[in-house]
Swiss-Prot record:
It comes from Dendroaspis polylepis polylepis (Black mamba). One of its GO terms (molecular function) is toxin activity. InterPro entries: Snake_3FTx, Snake_toxin-like_sf, Snake_toxin_con_site, Toxin_cobra-type. This is Muscarinic toxin alpha. Belongs to the three-finger toxin family. Short-chain subfamily. Aminergic toxin sub-subfamily.
Amino acid sequence: LTCVTSKSIFGITTENCPDGQNLCFKKWYYLNHRYSDITWGCAATCPKPTNVRETIHCCETDKCNE
């Protein structure tokens, strides 16, 4: 599985997930009418939001967390 780990004006950076990590995730924190502090990566299980302003999307196909 290949997941996006960062995005910039120059494109995306990806990584091949290690064995046992079969999910891609994108986590972002909502603040002041815009999304900030976005995190991408691989996971074995879908992370849980730590507060009401945090949103997490998990998926199972290559680069699905773009």
